Regions:
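Alpha-helical transmembrane cores and adjacent cytosolic helix/loop segments
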Residues: 2-220
Length: 220
């Protein structure tokens, strides 16, 4: 039964989602989520560059990671194992870019002591939280799918809302305590999470053995 099957699906096994089996509705949902995450990435990257926020740089990496994850759900699952392995290495590298920017900004803030503009930081955090809430709601119908990527995409959107709350808290605290430390602390926390994510993607890519795919092809 497909994603929109007409029979009672309450007791059916959850559908297996891949790039080839995603039905029209599910693919449309994932595509929208990917687009929203890309929008959030550019918004936070631009604002972070303007106000010098370590937290926003770190959260921009989260948006980039989620965009690439959803893009892989739509496309890369249909690739060969070797191609997916190369894509995973590239994904890990891309995630590192904003994360490194977050650490660099945090170090600069420690030296200069200049805090980001708190109102802009807070408003941007609210915008990012709205984007992540919309993504979480869109993915809610797919969260029980028998696919680690699909469930991971939903969990990532849900967890990103919590990260946005941390950034919003940093902005509010900075309004009353004009210091760079709230932004620095939140930026470092989210940055560490991003480094861990990049490390996991890299290690998973290394663990995938293209020879296994060749063996499977020989058995067919």
């Amino acid at each position: 039964m497909g994603f929109d099957g007409t029979r009672a699906g309450r007791y059916d096994a959850p559908p297996v989602f891949t790039s080839s089996t995603l039905d029209h509705r599910a693919r449309k949902i994932v595509a929208w989520v990917a687009g929203l995450n890309l929008l959030g990435f550019f918004i936070e990257l631009i604002v972070a560059s303007i106000i010098g926020s370590a937290a926003l740089f770190a959260d921009a990496a989260d948006f980039l990671e989620d965009f690439l994850m959803n893009l892989l759900v739509l496309t890369a699952l249909g690739w060969s194992l070797a191609s997916r392995r190369k894509a995973s290495f590239g994904l890990a590298g891309l995630i590192l870019i904003p994360a490194i920017a977050a650490f660099g900004t945090a170090i600069w803030k420690m030296i200069s002591g200049e805090p980001p503009e708190p109102l802009t930081l807070s408003v941007t955090a609210i915008i990012a939280m709205v984007i992540n809430l919309v993504c979480a709601i869109l993915l809610m119908n797919l969260r029980k799918a028998d696919s680690a990527l699909m469930r991971g995409a939903w969990l990532a959107a849900r967890n990103d809302v919590l990260a946005n709350l941390l950034i919003l808290a940093a902005g509010v605290v900075t309004i009353f305590w004009f210091s760079a430390w709230p932004d620095i602390v939140v930026g470092l926390v989210i940055g560490v999470i991003n480094l861990t994510a990049a490390k996991e993607v890299y290690e998973q890519a290394r663990a995938e053995d293209p020879e296994l795919e060749m063996d499977d092809d020989d058995d067919d």
